[in-house]
Swiss-Prot record:
Disulfide feature: none
Record protein name field: Trichohyalin-like protein 1
Domain EF-hand: 48-83
SUPFAM superfamilies in UniProt: EF-hand (SSF47473)
Region described as Disordered: 102-792, 858-890
Ranges of biased composition (kind: Acidic residues): 524-536
Gene designation per UniProt: TCHHL1
Polar residues bias: start-end ranges: 113-128, 443-452, 538-554, 586-598, 771-780
Domain of life: Eukaryota
SMART domains membership: S_100
Stored CDD domains: S-100
Length: 904
């Protein structure tokens, strides 16, 4: 950092140094900029570069005010220097290496002479000039680069070193490459130890390159262009972009080399032609002598083509030239696009050595070129190795950086290509990788991003984080692996499985469950999109939390709640789901233990059974509620995240409970068996169930009353909340005392909750209908709700226990209905508010809990449209928070029980 700071300060000082005309030294004129570039960079850039900078100095004047500010200078000068940066660095490194090169060159000259037959180590300043020419003339650069590829292939000398023997004899030697190659082969045999590694790398490349060897050997820009196109098609566009910078770097390097190796560009142009000739001959020889040429010409032609491609083809081609191995990879992935799967491994293997940098590629290339130099001359080999070392250095920064990125990108891309070849869908791969990433923590976000309900994703994040922590152990990995390996498929499958579980319920309650089925069927389809929204918030909590069952549950729950996510837009089932969730979660929050216990089984059953019925009614009522619930849910769901968000998660918990209820019903049927054995439990649950049905119906009765009665309902809510709080504490005590009864209670209660939720879902309507509906309608509705529950339960679970439970529920429901009828009559006599208060308070504790949260939260939702009472809303907000907090726990318990019961 101190060095960086000094460098930055040096830049600033340099800027101010030349900004003399400005008293503040804050701006530069075009003349001062020219002076700055000449004074500071004149040693690195040729006059043509400085002239180009001067000519294009207006580019630095971003704001066109004739003055170049420091920020403009920094931005623009680095854009200009970007092409020259590597050249500068390569020049610096080449200067250091050129010191050592003469020795190597002396040794290599002999080899080069032997290999090239000329032994003429024509310091190819022209190569760099040719490269220099490349910026000016890409066509010649393609030719020059072929020359370079030929000459460099033969005498691959660092262009930085001016050691590229653009030896036409070298070309002849390349024409004589077979011989030279054999000689070089001998030299290679001598350098095999070195070459083995490099050749192994090269062979890995050559393996990948061999399919490409012909093209790379030929190194015909067209072939590579085609390959580059393929590669670019397969994702080399980023690589191309990177290669563009690399090409620029190469050109900059070339230009830098030209600067250091200023020589007649004529040689460059001449050598391009000769390079073309050599190239054709190389192609011939490379085609003839593919194994050696593959190793030699491929590296050389690859390297030659690399600049050539860089110049003639495109940055992407240059990428491949710079990334010949990347090209090999890409060709492996592309030509082996067929072999993409194998190529990724090869390219990965190549990439692995290349992981430390495409410098390793360049090193391998250097090794290849070393092989070539060995073939073409060990001097050239060392030179080419030095060249590539320099290129590594030059490219090293970017080659290591961009090449490393490209390697990673291409490794991932080969993987992507593999998966593409495997899946045939790159997007699916992205989806899988995203799903993997999502699995890694964006799972909820993935779902939520799909769901798009991000308030729920937040809830998901929190609840899921907790429940995932707990239930991820159980099945989050499975759930997300499943849901994300086949994110849409398995989720949809799981959701559809759950939906199928619910399907009988949905089918039976099709009319009623139209939205339920929508919330299940559509969400199954939409689950991918919506499951992230609402399903995730609550269910992702439970889904991710207890993703074993929640996978399906997440699907179903994602279904119902995902459509509930849709329904937030719809506002019906979302408000329903939210109200269900609220009532359920409210009940859960109020009776977390009881509901956690009971919720898994019958709660979910009841949720499913009642949810269809409740939803069927809720479809009607929530249609009434839709507008208020939508507005409320929108207001409270997104707005008041306390009640709304918790409610939405609760709505999802409803779906979760209904979906979890599928499994929970299964698991809790077992639990229900024991729980059913206890008539007290059944009685409690049944009494609470009718209570909830009554409260639901009562709420329904309360619902239709009107907005005025909503105000009363709000007051009733407040009173209910108080009475419900008392009842909640009492019922919690009772339920905690009789946890098993509570379990069956809650199981029964779950239907009641569902009924209550339905009531709460209806509760907006109930709010509207608070005391306007007679108790008989409440009984009827309760019966309807409970009948669908029993029917759905029977449909979903036709077990005798379930039937037995249903019978007891019906019996006790009748008893409780009678009691509640009396209470309702009394309450109705006392008034709608008293009705709601007395009924909800008299409703079974669990139902009171559910009704409490249901009434409070649904009221909060229903009321926010018209008269959202602050008390009701505030209370639901804590309840929503409790639901958020307690519900995940309840869901956890429920999901844990579900998991345990499912395991059982």
């Amino acid at each position: 950092m101190p060095q960086l700071l000094r460098n930055v300060l040096c830049v600033i000082e340099t800027f101010h140094k030349y900004a003399s005309e400005d008293s503040n030294g804050a701006t530069l004129t075009g003349r001062e900029l020219k002076q700055l570039i000449q004074g500071e960079f004149g040693d690195f850039f040729q006059p043509c570069v400085l002239h180009a900078v001067e000519k294009n100095s207006n580019l630095l004047n971003i704001d066109s005010n004739g003055i170049i500010s420091f920020d403009e200078f920094v931005l623009a000068i680095f854009n200009l220097l970007n092409l020259c940066y590597l050249d500068i660095k390569s020049l610096l490194s080449s200067e250091l290496r050129q010191v050592t090169k003469p020795e190597k060159e002396k040794l290599d000259d002999v080899d080069v002479q032997a290999t090239t037959g000329d032994g003429q180590w024509t310091v190819g300043t022209s190569p760099t000039q040719e490269k220099r020419m490349l910026p000016s003339g890409m066509a010649s650069s393609s030719q020059l680069i072929p020359e370079e590829s030929g000459a460099v292939g033969n005498n691959r000398v660092d262009p930085w070193r001016e050691a590229k023997t653009h030896n036409f004899p070298g070309e002849a030697s390349e024409h004589n490459d077979p011989k030279n190659k054999h000689l070089e082969g001998d030299e290679q045999s001598q350098e095999v130890a070195q070459d083995i590694q490099t050749t192994e790398d090269n062979e890995g490349q050559l393996k990948t390159n061999k399919p490409m060897a012909g093209s790379k050997k030929t190194s015909s820009p067209t072939e590579r262009k085609g390959q580059d196109k393929e590669i670019s098609q397969e994702g080399d566009e980023p690589a191309r972009e990177q290669s563009v910078s690399k090409i620029r770097d190469q050109f900059g390097e070339q230009e830098g080399n030209l600067a250091t190796q200023s020589s007649p560009p004529k040689e460059a142009t001449q050598r391009p032609c000769e390079d073309q000739e050599v190239r054709t001959e190389k192609e011939k020889h490379s085609n003839i002598q593919e194994p050696p040429l593959q190793r030699e010409d491929e590296p050389s032609s690859q390297h030659a083509d690399l600049p050539e491609q860089a110049a003639a083809r495109s940055p992407s081609q240059t990428q491949k030239s710079t990334d010949s191995k990347d090209v090999c990879r890409m060709f492996d992935t592309q030509e082996p696009g067929k072999d993409a799967d194998q190529t990724p491994a090869k390219t990965k293997n190549l990439g692995e050595p290349e992981d430390y940098g495409r410098t390793s590629e360049t090193q391998e290339k250097e090794c290849e070129t070393k092989d070539l130099p060995v073939q073409y001359g060990s001097r050239n080999g060392s030179e080419t190795s030095d060249m590539r070392d320099e290129r590594k250095e030059r490219r090293g920064p970017e080659a290591h950086g961009t090449a490393g990125q490209k390697e990673r990108d291409r490794k991932t891309r080969p993987l992507v290509l593999e998966t593409q070849t495997q899946d045939g869908k790159y997007q699916e791969l992205q989806g899988l990788s995203k799903s993997k990433d999502a699995e890694k923590g964006s799972e909820t976000q993935y779902l939520s991003s799909e769901g798009g309900d991000q308030t729920h994703p937040e809830l998901e994040g929190t609840a899921v984080s907790g429940e995932e922590a707990e239930h991820t152990k159980e099945g989050t990995a499975e759930a997300f692996v499943n849901s994300k390996n086949a994110p849409a498929a398995e989720r949809t499958l799981g959701a559809r499985e759950r939906t199928q579980d619910l399907a009988p319920l949905e089918k039976q309650s099709v009319g009623e469950n139209t939205r339920v089925t929508k919330t299940h069927d559509q969400p199954v389809e939409e689950e991918d999109g919506y499951q992230g929204e609402d399903p995730e918030s609550p269910f992702t909590q439970s889904d991710e939390g207890s993703s074993e069952t929640p996978n399906s549950l997440a699907s179903e729950e994602g279904n119902s709640s995902s459509e509930t996510g849709e329904l937030p837009v719809q506002g019906d089932s979302q408000s329903q789901g939210d109200q269900h969730g609220e009532s359920v979660q409210g009940g859960h929050n109020n009776n977390p233990d009881t509901q956690r216990q009971g919720t898994p089984g019958e709660k979910n059953r009841a949720l499913e059974a009642v949810v269809p019925a409740v939803r069927g009614e809720d479809v009607q009522l929530t249609e009434d509620q839709e507008q208020p619930a939508r507005g409320e849910h929108k207001n409270q769901g997104p707005g008041t995240k306390g009640p709304g968000a918790a409610v939405e998660p609760n709505g999802h918990p409803e779906a979760q409970e209904s979906t979890a209820g599928d499994e929970n019903r299964k698991s809790l049927e077992i639990e229900i068996t024991g729980a059913l054995d206890e008539d007290f439990t059944d009685q409690l649950s049944l009494m609470q169930l009718p209570g909830k049905g009554d409260s639901r119906n009562e709420l329904k009765v309360q619902g239709p009353s009107s907005k005025e009665e909503k105000g009363r309902a709000t007051e009733a809510q407040n009173t209910l909340l108080e009475s419900l709080d008392e009842d909640n504490s009492a019922s919690l005590k009772i339920q905690l005392e009789t946890k098993e009864p509570v379990t069956s209670e809650e199981e029964d209660e779950s239907p009641q909750e569902l009924a209550g939720e339905g009531g709460d879902q209806k509760s907006p309507a109930k709010k509207e209908h608070n005391s306007s509906v007679p108790w008989s309608s409440l009984e009827k509705q309760m019966q309807r709700d409970q009948e669908p529950c029993s029917v759905e339960r029977g449909a979903v679970y036709s077990s005798p226990l379930y039937q037995y439970l249903q019978e007891k529920i019906l019996q006790q429901t009748n008893v409780t209905q009678e009691e509640h009828q009396k209470q309702v009559q009394i309450a109705q006599a006392s008034g709608p508010e008293l009705c709601s208060v007395s009924l909800t308070s008299e409703i079974s504790d669990c139902s009171v809990f559910f009704n409490y949260s249901q009434a409070s939260q649904p009221y909060t939702r229903g009321l926010p449209l018209d008269e959202s009472p602050a008390g009701a809303q505030e209370t639901p907000a804590p309840q929503a928070l409790e639901d958020k907090q307690g519900h995940p726990q309840r869901e956890r318990l429920v999901l844990q029980r579900e998991a345990s019961t499912t395991k059982q």
